[in-house]
A protein has these predicted regions:
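N-terminal helical cap/lid subdomain that shapes the substrate entry/recognition surface
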Residues: 3-10, 14-100, 108
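Conserved Rossmann-like nucleotide-cofactor binding loop
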Residues: 13, 20, 120-121, 175
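Substrate-recognition/cap helix-loop segment adjacent to the acidic, metal-dependent catalytic center
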Residues: 32, 100-146, 153-162, 203
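A short, structured active-site edge motif that brings together acidic residues
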Residues: 42, 46, 72-75, 134-149
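Conserved Lys-Pro-Asp/Glu-containing loop-to-beta segment of HAD-superfamily phosphomonoesterases
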Residues: 148-181
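Acidic, Mg2+-coordinating phosphoryl-transfer loop and its flanking beta/alpha structural elements
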Residues: 169-212
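Short acidic-hydrophobic, aromatic-tinged amphipathic segments that line or gate anion-handling sites
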Residues: 211-219
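Short amphipathic alpha-helix with an adjacent loop that forms part of the alpha/beta core around
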Residues: 219-225
């Protein structure tokens, strides 16, 4: 057992979801509301907090544009786009963000875990695709908590099982930062230079007392040295 544990969010941290989850939001809103929401607008919602769940965000935007659609109807359409028939869904557009060797080095020093707003099985599908030999334990998904981020429940569960070891949480949204702060876990924020609101994201992380703000996961070792 390593002396410390790194907990990762998944979307925007381990994988680039610009053309998967974010594109699914765009297409779902277009389908139900007949409007095109832009990537900067999606980031603006994320920066408000409370929209870690992309189903909830999609439904909210649809409702804002006057379309009365049941939440589950939005979820079903969203999931159909995301998964497709198993081979043509937008999930196939995801890109693994870690460079070769990064996790070999991290795993030699730390135990690794995941606390994500995804369904756990969706996280496992992506991990199996990109990093089948990599061990994250535990993997806490949305079905494993009663309150989604920014609630700290997932981090508190991981901390309770960590036996007092030091924990870091690596995330890319203000909800991740607030979850970490509520759990009294040091937060490392990822503010991608490709983000349409990069400066605002970094400022929000600093306001939540982030231990560090980095461009992407490949800079993580520099702040854990």
């Amino acid at each position: 057992m390593a002396e410390a544990l790194i907990v990762f969010d998944m979307d925007g941290v381990l994988v680039d979801v610009t053309e998967s989850y974010r594109e699914t939001i765009v297409r779902t809103v277009e389908h139900f509301a007949g409007v095109t929401v832009t990537r900067p607008q999606i980031q603006d919602y994320k920066n408000q907090g409370g929209f870690n769940d992309d189903w909830k965000l999609s439904h909210h935007i649809v409702a804002q544009h006057g379309a009365a659609v049941e939440f589950q109807t939005v979820v079903d359409y969203f999931q159909g786009l995301f998964h497709g028939n198993g081979t043509d869904g937008l999930i196939q557009r995801e890109r693994w963000m870690a460079r070769d060797g990064l996790f070999d080095r991290l795993a030699a020093r730390f135990d690794l875990a995941i606390f994500t707003g995804r369904l756990r099985w969706e996280a496992e599908v992506t991990l199996h695709r990109f990093a089948p030999s990599l061990r994250f334990d535990p993997i806490i998904g949305m079905e494993d908590v009663t309150a989604l981020k920014p609630a700290p429940e997932g981090l508190l569960k991981i901390a309770a099982a960590a036996g007092g070891r030091k924990i870091w949480y690596v995330g890319d949204t203000v909800d991740d930062a607030r979850s970490a702060r509520a759990a009294a876990v040091p937060f490392i924020g990822i503010a991608s230079p490709d983000s349409p609101r990069r400066a605002e994201v970094a400022s929000l992380f600093q306001a939540e007392n982030a231990a560090a703000v980095i461009d992407d996961i490949n800079q993580l070792e520099s702040v854990l040295a």
